[in-house]
Curated annotation (Swiss-Prot):
Its EC number is 6.3.5.-. Allows the formation of correctly charged Asn-tRNA(Asn) or Gln-tRNA(Gln) through the transamidation of misacylated Asp-tRNA(Asn) or Glu-tRNA(Gln) in organisms which lack either or both of asparaginyl-tRNA or glutaminyl-tRNA synthetases. The reaction takes place in the presence of glutamine and ATP through an activated phospho-Asp-tRNA(Asn) or phospho-Glu-tRNA(Gln). SUPFAM superfamilies: GatB/YqeY motif, Glutamine synthetase/guanido kinase. It comes from Geobacillus kaustophilus (strain HTA426). This is Aspartyl/glutamyl-tRNA(Asn/Gln) amidotransferase subunit B. Keywords: ATP-binding, Ligase, Nucleotide-binding, Protein biosynthesis. One of its GO terms (biological process) is glutaminyl-tRNAGln biosynthesis via transamidation. Heterotrimer of A, B and C subunits. One of its GO terms (molecular function) is asparaginyl-tRNA synthase (glutamine-hydrolyzing) activity. The keyword Isomerase does not apply. Belongs to the GatB/GatE family. GatB subfamily. It is an enzyme of class 6 (ligase).
């Protein structure tokens, strides 16, 4: 029997407001434990929450960017459960009247585009953070308690781990572009739980789902789903039954491990939050927020293709993060050829960032210096090979590319007389290669070009070297 995989994702995104969702405590990552809390965060008796307007507007902005309908009336509810990182014994969330519904995003996998529905987006507060010491007790840091979150719940439209990965990449890009969150998984500002079930191919009835947690990277989401699909398939093929449960992805073994039998919504005993009034969102407020949404990845990608003639793949890679897209546009605005700028960012810059595990803002390279270097290539001052030496200096130390070229003596040799002399010396030293080229072996010319470049320490103008070699060989 063949099975179809059915996946839905629940993504929690921390909003980068200045203060928390229901209190005036600062909302910032990395402070010493329990230094960014107050009596509201800690649930002291008699205290009352006050809703953060910016958190609401950030949630609206994200929901609109994800094509959601924004509620005219929405409310908050208490989700009741006990856990050491939840001092009130309930979480303020939204249950039956979420802020946003019926959204979608478009993904592309293996050249095929597909819309993934978004069931709902709602606002809630984050819990504190537990650290298990391993010697019999746990530490609780309440700095995160009360941080504003949006939970983005997808429709069960995802049919493979690859589609799940593409959905998360696209979702992250859109949220980052809106500016409401930095979406740093390593800091917990973007977290994902996955629901997965199998059903017979062709069936429209959902199977019993399993929820996966501890998915701390997009790759772990993909690996966790791949393992869980195989685990469930094995059980079903052997005549077994899938239980509704929550499982944890084990990063060491790349398997999923049982955490607990899955709770239903009735276990949380939701009821309306009595300390917060109904929230009304009129059309004027909606339009004001909508007007603040910047150009999003798909629109930017289309513009790069139409205005600058970039290949679709280049445009897609460049717009994957707002930081890279902004850097690219600033480089072009400073006079760099768009295609050359694209190539340098996609190959050399991205390669350096990946190797060094850094972000664009961590390096000394600026759009102005990259554009300056590219213009030196364009006007023939340096070759692409020499440019790599300049690039290394710019990335690590910054500076003016023109000044670096002069100080290090890297100016490309374009003097025809000087190069012709070197070409003649190379031809005299390699008569066999000359004969090979005359006999139709084109690779011999490449060897001779390499010898000239070696003699000039990479500073000869390659097109001019080619031209002179062909001319001089023709005379022999």
């Amino acid at each position: 029997m063949n099975f179809e995989t059915v996946i839905g994702l629940e993504v929690h995104v921390e909003l980068k407001t200045k203060s928390k969702i229901f209190s005036s405590s600062p909302n910032a990552f990395g402070a010493p434990p329990n230094t960014q809390t107050n009596v509201i965060d800690l649930g002291y008796p008699g205290v009352l929450p006050v809703l953060n307007r910016q958190a609401v507007e950030f949630a609206m902005k994200a929901a609109m960017a994800l094509n959601c309908e924004i509620a005219t009336e929405t409310k908050f509810d208490r989700k009741n459960y006990f856990y050491p990182d939840n001092p009130k014994a309930y979480q303020i969330s939204q249950y039956d009247q979420p802020l946003g519904r019926n959204g979608w995003i478009e993904i592309e996998v293996n050249g095929k585009k597909k819309k993934i529905g978004i069931t709902r987006i709602h606002l809630e507060e984050d819990a504190g953070k537990l650290t298990h010491t391993g010697d019999g007790y746990s530490l609780v840091d309440f700095n995160r308690q009360g941080t504003p979150l949006i939970e983005i719940v997808s429709e069960p439209d995802i049919r493979s781990p690859e589609e799940a990965y593409a959905y998360l990449e696209k979702l992250k890009a859109i949220i980052q572009y809106t500016g409401v969150s930095d979406c740093k998984m390593e800091e917990g500002s973007l977290r994902c739980d996955a629901n997965i079930s199998l059903r017979p191919l062709g069936s429209d009835k959902f199977g019993t789902k399993t929820e996966l947690k501890n998915l701390n990277s997009f790759n772990f989401v993909r690996m966790g789903l791949e393992y869980e699909a195989k685990r469930q398939e094995k059980i079903l093929l052997s005549g077994g039954v899938i239980r509704q449960e929550t499982r944890r992805f084990d990063e060491a073994t790349k398997t999923t491990v049982l955490m607990r039998v899955k709770e239903g919504s009735e276990d949380y005993r939701y009821f309306p939050e009595p300390d917060l009034v109904m929230l009304y969102i009129d059309d004027e407020w909606k339009e004001r927020v909508r007007a603040s949404i910047p150009e999003l990845p798909d629109a930017r990608r289309k513009r790069y293709i139409e205005e600058w003639g970039l290949p679709e793949y280049d445009a897609k890679v460049l717009t994957l993060t707002k930081e890279m897209a902004d850097f690219f546009e600033a480089t072009v605005a400073n006079g760099a050829d768009p295609k050359l700028a694209s190539n340098w960012l996609m190959v050399e810059v991205s390669g350096y960032l990946n190797a060094e595990q850094k972000e664009l803002h961590d390096i000394a390279l600026t759009p102005e210096s990259l554009a300056g270097m590219i213009k030196l290539i364009q006007n023939g001052t340096i070759s692409s090979k020499i440019a790599k030496k300049v690039f290394k200096e710019l990335v690590e130390h910054g500076g003016d590319p023109e000044k670096i070229v002069k100080e290090k003596g890297l100016v490309q040799i374009s003097d025809e007389g000087a190069l012709r002399k070197i070409v003649l010396e190379v031809l005299d030293a390699n008569p066999q290669s000359v004969e090979d080229y005359k006999n139709g072996k084109d690779r011999a010319l490449g060897f001779l070009v390499g010898q000239v470049m070696k003699a000039t320490k990479g500073q000869a103008n390659p097109p001019l070297v080619n031209k002179l070699l062909v001319e001089e060989i023709g005379k022999r």
